[in-house]
Regions:
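Hydrophobic alpha-helical membrane-insertion segments, chiefly the h-region
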Residues: 22-33
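N-terminal Sec-pathway targeting helices
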Residues: 2-23
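Compositionally biased, low-structure terminal segments
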Residues: 8, 18-19, 45, 202, ...
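Charged, low-complexity, helix-prone segments enriched in Lys/Glu/Asp/Gln
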Residues: 9-11, 194-197
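Short, structured surface segments that line ligand/substrate-binding pockets
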Residues: 199-205
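Non-catalytic macromolecular-recognition regions in eukaryotic signaling proteins
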Residues: 31-195, 210-247
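Hydrophobic, Leu/Ile/Phe/Ala-enriched alpha-helical segments that form helix-helix packing faces
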Residues: 1, 205-207
Length: 247
């Protein structure tokens, strides 16, 4: 009898141990799944990333006897579309969306990377200090989007900013017209390999309810060979590699 009691006790202990290990393993799998896949049913989703690459010449004040004396900038306009999730049952409102932790993971061979927000509603960019993005930028939720005043509709909208490479190159010419696109880089003997770069940043969606979701975005610029194609673009709608997690 005593041997049976001890045997049953050992079995019971082993079963409890097995259940404990199983529960821990299950919790571990859930945590791993969340780490890999992130939030699966957010109130608002990042639905699209559009990047438009080209180049422009900024006319210098002193041109001498020449028609053109321009500093050449390689530009990459970034559009992040935030869309309301129709499958989310509860009502939520966007408080703000922040771009932060901006890093240049791979620097270009020539030039200096800087980020700017538009100076007006027509997405015109003035490269002045007050439009420059330094460590972060916050777009406040409002009734409707207002690019100039850094506002986004609290039910979803589009965030716009520019990644610019101030190449340090110039082009001087007496041509009557100057084509402002990526082919301008060739005139300054700049090739696509010279200006390749990789930028990453976090996008944080904060709701009025106090919940925040953060995801990391990585962008390679310019898109394709802008020096020969003039204007190139990337329209990304598959967001599997952008994992959002609650903060």
């Amino acid at each position: 009898m005593e041997e049976n009691y001890i045997f049953k006790k050992i079995i019971k202990r082993n079963v409890l141990f097995f259940i404990l290990v199983l529960v821990i393993a299950l919790i571990g799998l859930i945590i791993l799944k969340y780490h890999v896949e992130g939030e699966q049913n957010m109130p608002f989703d990042l639905s699209e990333i559009l990047v438009v690459s080209t180049a422009e010449g900024n006319q210098k004040e002193e041109t001498g006897d020449n028609n053109w004396n321009v500093d050449i900038y390689q530009t990459n306009d970034v559009y992040l579309n935030i869309k309301k999730n129709k499958n989310y049952k509860d009502t939520e409102i966007i408080k703000n969306i922040e771009i932060k932790n901006i890093n240049i993971d791979e620097k270009p061979s020539i030039g200096k990377i800087e980020l700017y927000v538009p100076s007006n509603e027509n997405e015109i960019y003035n490269y002045e200090e007050n439009y420059k993005i330094n460590s972060n930028i916050v777009f406040e939720g409002d009734k409707k989007s207002d690019i100039k005043n850094l506002k986004i509709s609290n039910q979803g909208g589009t965030i716009v900013f520019r990644i610019v490479n101030k190449t340090g190159k110039e082009y001087i010419s007496n041509d009557e017209e100057l084509k402002h696109d990526g082919t301008l880089l060739q005139k300054a003997e700049v090739n696509n390999e010279d200006i390749k770069a990789k930028i990453s940043f976090d996008i944080v969606i904060t709701l009025e309810s106090g919940v925040s979701f953060s995801g990391k975005i990585t962008i390679e610029i310019p898109v394709d060979d802008v020096t020969t194609q003039g204007v190139t673009n990337l329209d990304k709608k598959d967001m599997k590699d952008v994992v959002f997690k609650r903060q």
